[in-house]
């Protein structure tokens, strides 16, 4: 069995024909987060994936096997939720609550994509978003899953937060509420990079 133990850095340019001829390793997101994995190439060949710990593979990555051969990574179709909203404010609130729960999210133009989760689907629907189950490749934003506590200062935000907590309490039977009230205004703008095409900010007043 061949061992795949190296990933070529994204800034290294390879001939397109060379990459196209390489066999594909098609993996769902959960499998792409594992540095040790027994996998099967699309050709049917079994391989062992042994990469540095903490490696998260992305669609289009090129790997190198122990015999020097190339293998290209492809994101598999998997069960996901497509989240849309009638306005930017609702979608932003949905994104906030997903981020507050450390949920990996792929950001698109007017749409959020996350791994299928019926609890999150229920929460997002109650927040006013439209949630559709689909089968699609999932490639969330890299390195953007920091957690956080609520810093809302307006009644509408507090209602949204309480609703989100209620949904999770119903499903899990206990509360994880983290409330921090302040007497001063503050504003935290978080730019989400070039993939965030709809100018997604988290501003709190």
Curated annotation (Swiss-Prot):
Xref: InterPro entries: UreE (IPR012406), UreE_C_dom (IPR007864), UreE_N (IPR004029), UreE_N_sf (IPR036118)
Chain segments carrying region Disordered: 170-205
Domain of life: Bacteria
GO cellular component: cytoplasm
Entry's Gene Ontology molecular function annotations: nickel cation binding; unfolded protein binding
Pfam families: UreE_C (PF05194), UreE_N (PF02814)
SUPFAM superfamilies: Urease metallochaperone UreE, C-terminal domain, Urease metallochaperone UreE, N-terminal domain
An annotated GO BP: protein-containing complex assembly
Compartment annotation: Cytoplasm
Keywords from the named record: Chaperone, Cytoplasm, Nickel, Nickel insertion
Keyword Transcription carried by entry: no
Sequence ranges of Basic and acidic residues compositional bias: 170-192
Known function: Involved in urease metallocenter assembly. Binds nickel. Probably functions as a nickel donor during metallocenter assembly.
HAMAP family the UniProt entry points to: UreE
Similarity field: Belongs to the UreE family.
UniProt name for this protein: Urease accessory protein UreE
Species this chain originates from: Burkholderia pseudomallei (strain 668)
